Amino acid sequence: SSDLENLDLHTLNQPLIADVRARLQPQQKYIRGLFCGGTLCDETMFAVMEKHGDVYSNIQPDPEFRLKDINRSIKHTFLDFGDDDFTNGKPHPMIDPTNRISRLIEEARDPEVAVIVMDFVLGFGSHEDPVGSTIEAIKEAKAIAAAEGRELIILAYVLGTDLDTPSLEQ
């Protein structure tokens, strides 16, 4: 779609990481993860924990780093929006991304946030267009940061196959 053509899409590699780091402001030091999938949230959180000790989450096994208030991020924060904390009486974020989209905009306003990591899960039980439903919010989040002289990096992981609807290619 034309929305996707306007995005600066790249696969992750070391030169790209160095380039991104150079574009960040000194105060931009935190990663925020906004996940639909609990396993993807967990794996990403533990990967970040290998380099950083201050990683908070609503699914953090260490009580010291479990968020007391899921509506307020602390330092590096990884949220599983599919956890009961967020889905009690509400649809799962793979079906309805509204909660996660609101949080994306909120996190974009934090001048200490450098990167927002998100997953998009395709296939049965998922939103008919999970990426498309979030594109405008991603552009808005980047614009919020740009208006404050910051570049906000969105790192997205798409989980699916060409047999899923929508397909991985779409």
Positions of the model-derived regions?
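Structural motif
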Residues: 11-30, 40
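C-terminal non-catalytic interaction/assembly regions of soluble proteins
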Residues: 4, 22, 85-86, 90-170
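Short glycine-cluster motifs
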Residues: 27-28, 33-105, 110
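Conserved alpha/beta enzyme-core scaffold
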Residues: 4-11
